[in-house]
Amino acid sequence: QAHQYSKGIVPKVGALPMKNRFEPPVAACVAVKKALPSVPHYLQAHYWWAYVHPRAVHVFERQWLVNLILWGNYKRLCNAVLQAYGNHLPGRTLQIACAYGDLTPRLAACVAPGGALEIIDILPIQLENLAGKLAAAAPIKLHCMDSAALTFADASFDRALLFFLLHEQPQAVRERTLAEAFRVVRPGGTLTIVDYAPPSRFNPLRYFWTPVLDRLEPFARDLFSEEIAAWLPKDRNFSRVDEQRFFGGMYQMLTLKVAEARPIGKPASR
């Protein structure tokens, strides 16, 4: 547990982890507000079973299970992210929301000397779980923060990653999250989004998996029926660097390059 203390994470007490408290942070390890952000109602109402409940991490923090949920595509999608980054992360990298599985440790292994990987999540229990997967000397910082209201300065990161977060958010929150991601990435930096996509009509999971998601993840249907472009901020200028589809179109990786804010009246490039 020593590495958890070094990141300012509350250690486990008995069988259950502490959900909503942090110890005072150690300097340069974790940026934590005196008052933690409140957990959004939609997260409590629809995702308590996957992220909020103390037992959630014990159930879902299993590599094979994460891979099963993504129909065997977890490693493939993680590999695509790392390959897009050239397995090299200089400067500051922001991962917006924790993820089950080994994605973050693999990202941490790619951080260049002098660089840093910073991860935000609104749930302390998820940050605690992530801390337990990272080496004590990993060049990381953890922040308890709302993805729709980041407290970072403008243009403070070289790149940001959204890995299967957008489909879990209502449209208004999704749009604010994307706007915040663009705000904190510097001009010339990139935003990479990995998530569901509208599947090919020949993909049988289009007809089978959507009803399952409707029951378990009520906002996911948006990404099955619309492109991410529908929620991108209209006041930001960016270009598409790369777009890949996987597994009969059901998953996507979209990489966008952030440009200078466009003058009023000038159309944004897409």
Predicted feature residues:
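A short SAM/SAH-binding and catalytic strip from SAM-dependent methyltransferases
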Residues: 158-172
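A short glycine-rich, Lys/Arg-flanked "PGG" loop and its adjoining helix->strand segment in the class I
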Residues: 175-187
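C-terminal alpha-helical "lid/dimerization" subdomain adjacent to the S-adenosyl-L-methionine
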Residues: 48, 175, 192-253
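Class I SAM-dependent methyltransferase SAM/SAH-binding core
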Residues: 92-149
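Short glycine-dipeptide loop
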Residues: 113-114, 185-190
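A short acidic, Gly/Pro-enriched loop at the edge of an enzyme's catalytic core
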Residues: 148-160
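N-terminal, positively charged/glycine-rich alpha-helical extensions of SAM-dependent methyltransferases
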Residues: 17-62
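Conserved alpha-helix/loop element of class I SAM-dependent methyltransferases that forms part
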Residues: 69-90, 106
